[in-house]
A protein has these predicted regions:
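Conserved ATP-dependent adenylate/AMP-binding module captured primarily in the ANL superfamily
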Residues: 92-123, 152, 193-213
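ANL superfamily adenylate-forming
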Residues: 30, 110, 117-164
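Short beta-strand->loop structural element characteristic of the AMP-binding/adenylate-forming
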Residues: 64-66, 73, 77, 81-112, ...
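Conserved AMP-binding A3 loop
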Residues: 35-39, 168-195
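A short N-terminal helical cap/helix-turn-helix that marks the beginning
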Residues: 2-25
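Conserved pre-ATP/AMP-binding loop-to-beta segment of ANL
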Residues: 19-22, 153-172, 179, 204-213
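Conserved AMP-binding/adenylate-forming core of the ANL superfamily
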Residues: 24-70, 74, 78, 95-100, ...
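Conserved structural elements of the adenylate-forming
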Residues: 45-47, 164, 183-205
């Protein structure tokens, strides 16, 4: 029986098929946007994945993302997965004490800080000594930047495979009714959910379309 595709399988397949087509469009202010093709997205993710692997974290290590939705949020998550690690997603509006709790409770080995509206009130929740990387559009920080890292790092080679049961995402609840809870999602789970969402969208936009959502 054929093995079902997982999220990274689809990513590499789309890179090969639609490499020069725009994948992500990021508003950058002033009515301007930056487009990223499939090739560009995967190349940046591979470079950051190589950087993460160079840190010698344990397999499946938790790497946190504190950011609003953005093109580089997606690239960072792909890099986390390519490096053999697990995403810890933190709501971008969480208070400092909750940020601190999630980072410590999850055992996060690293943090990506991205576009945020309340960083000044959150940054005290970042544990001293935790390695951090600033994504493009992040608030001003002392952290090394995404761009600096990918400019000096060679991309991770090959079509990286993850197991269906590997933990893809540890998604913490908002904590509005108590201590945030970490909900575990495997690669099998997140892929099948994404396939279901795509199937629903295709009912409205068709299977063969240039429409981007």
């Amino acid at each position: 029986m054929a093995t079902k595709k997982l999220m990274l399988d689809y990513v590499f397949e789309n890179e090969a098929t639609y490499g020069d087509s725009v994948f992500l469009t990021q508003p950058v202010g002033g009515g301007q946007v930056t487009d990223y093709t499939w090739k560009q997205v995967v190349d940046q993710a591979r470079r950051m994945a190589a950087h993460i692997k160079a840190q010698k974290f344990e397999p499946g290590a938790r790497i946190a993302l504190l950011s609003k939705n953005s093109a580089h949020f997606i690239m960072a998550e792909l890099a986390i997965w390519m490096s053999g690690c697990t995403t810890v997603a933190i709501f971008p509006t969480e208070a400092a004490d909750t940020v601190k709790y999630v980072l410590e409770h999850s055992g996060a080995s690293m943090l990506f800080v991205g576009k945020l509206d309340v960083w000044e009130s959150q940054k005290s929740g970042i544990p001293t000594g935790l390695p951090c990387v600033a994504l493009p559009l992040s608030p001003k920080t002392s952290y090394e930047t995404w761009d600096a890292i990918i400019q000096r790092t060679q991309p991770l080679a090959g079509k990286i495979k993850r197991n269906p049961t590997d933990l893809a995402i540890l998604l913490y609840t908002s904590g509005s009714t108590g201590t945030p809870k970490g909900v575990m999602h495997s690669f099998e789970r997140v892929t099948r959910i994404a396939e279901g969402m795509l199937g629903e969208l295709q009912k409205y936009i068709g299977k063969e379309t240039d429409i981007r959502v």
